[in-house]
Amino acid sequence: MMRTTSVLSTLLAFTQAFYVPGTYKSYRDGDTIPLLVNKVYSDHSELQYAFTELPFVCPPTGRIRAGHLTSGTSITLNLGEVLRGDRIVVSDYELIMGIDEETRYLCSRTIDLEGIRKAKELIRDGYVAEWIVDNLPGATSFQTTDKSRKYYAAGFKLGDETTARSGGPAEYLLNNHVTLVIRYHRAPGKDGDKGKKVVVGFEVFPRSITASHRNDSGLPEHIEGEHEPLILAPQANSTNSTDTEDEPTTLTIPYTYSVYWREEERLEWQNRWDMYFVAQDDSANVHWLALVSSLLICGLLTAVVSVVLTRTIRSDIRGRQDLTLSSIKPKPNHKSLSPKREKANLLGPIADLDTEDIILDEEESEDVAAWKLLHGDIFRAPAYGGLLAPLIGSGMQLLYMAFGLLVLSTLGVLNPSFRGGYVSVGIGLFVFAGIFSGYFSARIYKTFGGQMWQKNVVVTAALIPGLLFATIFILNLFVWMQASSTALPFGTLIALIILWLCVQFPLVYAGSWFGFERMGAYTHPIRANAVPRQVPDHRWYLRNGQRFLLAGFVPFMVVFVELMFVVKSLWVDKTTYYYAFGFMGTVSAILMITVVEVTLVATYFLLRSENYHWWWHSFAIGGSSSIWVYAYLAYSYFTKLHISGFVSSMLFFAYGFLACAVYALLTGTVGFLAAYAFVRRIYGAIKVD
């Protein structure tokens, strides 16, 4: 208990995660800074689109830009950026440090009815565009409810849907003018002494301005005044044609922009991302309240487990001690096995309890605790052990990956400025953790009596990664048919296959060889009988369905609030960033402790009901909270989200199911290992003749 308290205290000290800002880039007055365009996305859809591929925006002209970059050139992306749908391209927008541009003409784009329809569809679904300057996403500026602080929401709207003034169908207004406000600060150190500056803010203010009343350069006559909006509808005056008999089928859209540079004296470069997290700071009290409630739940469970371990089980072992010791009737088919000393690990040597070894006699079964009657079957290999072992191995692989991601995120190595870093590093950790997957899978497989360890290697390396890859590939076909940037390019699919077969597979093989050949099976204090014991019928509350739902609800309550914030960031409001990794790390630690305690209690009551099928049971109990997590996702879909379209809905439920399956595998593995250590410990305290 003291050890648990100290661990939680340490984690509480780091609940506010920070980020490592990296290396700044400074600019002199007159330096050209490239503006990169990325993608458009919406809270109402799971489909994203590359900005430059939209049929109604200005296509790149191929002009040379800053740093010898050519407009239209794609920026090299990491694996995580590709998987999250990024398509970053150099634009034709020209930004020169320190030089304001009141109005500048970009281009005029003539679109047909299909282009108008696509623009209306994206505006109706609330799509926003993501642009990037100096690795900062263009943001829409807001004020807090008390108007004391300003904060950013990444992206800006493509347009607005309004009610027609004539009372007819809704009108769609396209934002064809943007005012770009670049905020800068004096560069730190010697660069600042040389007059250099760093970018600390990038604000975008979009407007819709009609195509009429423009000068010969395509600029509005008075940019600061009120203007009629640009309505997305074919217009006869979009061309010089005088034929009024035919219905207009095209619309010409002029694009302009303004640039203003403003010094920000109070915001330094290393804190420039704080503007995107102000909204999260307001919710810190909710995080703290949830953390306290999670600690209370964990503390209550700890008390229950303490009673079970220190009182109930100890009294079970000591109970009727004199009677059993005086009525020893040795049986030739039972032998006392002394546990061998292994290297220290979770499933290592069985520690001695402060109790004397007890001699059990089957004829005295009515006078001893029910769980001790299972000594001849408790370590019997489970059904489908060849499947359980790879699942446990993959669960350990995910556990190492999740731990690494949480540590790196809490330390600030993984942060929003490292775009795609969370996914890229996660894949890397998962692949290289294959060696742990093979090691644990092989040892458990051999413990179950398996001999074909090469077959176990194939199952371990292919089962979970193969199912994930196959599901993502099938979903990718639907996304590809929608021409979305979320669709994985063919080269990325090949790269993932290479990582899987050429990197992870050999690592799983190496770990399996070491675990199977060098370390061997885990030892058990009691040998299984030749004839299995019959399992009695259970009461209704001990049946699997009810038991899993009840056991899973407690861990779900621990993670509920953090899950709510994650769902909000991923689906409800995609313009926000989730960066409360300090809270997430602490809640994750509490979750693991809760899963362990719930599994121990459930396993104990299972054994008390004279059921020795605890292997799969402990795995299922540990992962049972995933049922509630998926139920919450479904609830959010129908009550909080506004996702429309068959493909987007399918992607939501499919990716939600994959996330819950991974979560179940991870927590199920934790539950299994806890139950395994628990069972070996309590049965190691008795000696059977």
Residue ranges of model-derived segments:
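Membrane-lumen (extracellular) interface motif
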Residues: 283-288, 396-462, 466-498, 559-585, ...
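Single-pass alpha-helical transmembrane segments
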Residues: 287-306, 499-506, 589-590, 594-597, ...
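Transmembrane-helix exit/juxtamembrane "anchor" motif
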Residues: 302-320, 505-523, 594-608, 666-685
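Cytosolic juxtamembrane regulatory segments of membrane proteins
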Residues: 25, 29, 319-333, 522-537, ...
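Hydrophobic alpha-helical transmembrane segments corresponding to the first two to three helices
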Residues: 274-480
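Hard-cation-handling environments
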Residues: 483, 517-519, 526, 539-542, ...
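Membrane-water interface at loop-to-transmembrane-helix junctions
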Residues: 374-393, 490-497, 528-555, 576-587
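Soluble extramembrane domains flanking the early transmembrane region of eukaryotic membrane proteins
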Residues: 3, 13-295
